[in-house]
Amino acid sequence: MYNVKIENTGRYVPDNIVTNEDISKIVDTNDKWIRERTGIKERRISKGENTSHMAIKSAKDVLRKSSIKADELDLIIVATCTPDCFVPSTACIVQDAIGATKATCFDINAACTGFMYALSVASQFIKSGQSKNALVIGAETLSKMINWQDRGTCVLFADGAGAAILTRSEEVGLISQYTCSDGTGGKFLKCDALPVENPYVSEKTEFLNKLSMEGREVFKFAVNAMIDSVHKVLEKTDYTIEDIDYIVPHQANIRIIEYVAKKLKVSQDKFYINLHRYGNTSGASIPIALDEMNEKNMLKKGDKIILVGFGGGLTFGAHLIQWN
């Protein structure tokens, strides 16, 4: 078995900044209401760029900083629940755009936990020897699945992409991982795809292709799932929460993060938070945050970092990584 590390990171967000004041012109809300309930001040919303466009730009960003070239990649995984199309996969579109001709490519849909799942899968490919260099991307255009008349969701979600290159390493980079799902709660966060319509269907089914969310149920699930994931990922090691330098949570809601910090008995200063600027970008939120930290030179060799997320499905999970 080989060791795996994150070799570098990248990100891309649309230029279009939508403030809470802008949202208040669309639905009955205001800046104070949004900030107090979510912690969000502004978010990035696409003016036409689709998921693959943002995924490609985040891929080019990480490749620009990496010592690994596109033709050295042998695996590309894109985590998204908002692909451009059913076929081809977003990963294949990225492959074509960056010239990664030797890569196996596929998408993963675990909603906001997608990047956690993709990291887990990519690391297993590398550990087993099947791959050496993997590009993992979380990319979402949530603005196209939002009901812009529903203030409970349209104030939260946004667009963006984050990327990381994983590579075989002599040093341990990905220390432990934990992923889990609870399909019984799938109805709490949902967006339909296409209805079954063909000459043999006699009755039309109810169909809603916009995101719906039961906020209270998602909150209860989220805080418990994140706390459980942190405990589970630490249980597999000799480390305790005191050994952790940073926690990078899914950037969903400041109240969730505050509650988790309190229950873990950890200072909120240990949590990297940027949701006030980007909103909830689903599977892109953790890699965007990680790249910001990397760009700011916050991460030092040997730092222990927990990445932890939750999302529709319901899905949840965490990774304990050591920065190399």
UniProtKB/Swiss-Prot annotation:
GO terms for cellular component: cytoplasm. GO terms for molecular function: 3-oxoacyl-[acyl-carrier-protein] synthase activity; beta-ketoacyl-acyl-carrier-protein synthase III activity. Belongs to the thiolase-like superfamily. FabH family. This is Beta-ketoacyl-[acyl-carrier-protein] synthase III. Its main location: cytoplasm. NCBIfam families: fabH, PRK09352.1. GO terms for biological process: fatty acid biosynthetic process; secondary metabolite biosynthetic process. HAMAP family: FabH (MF_01815). Its EC number is 2.3.1.180.
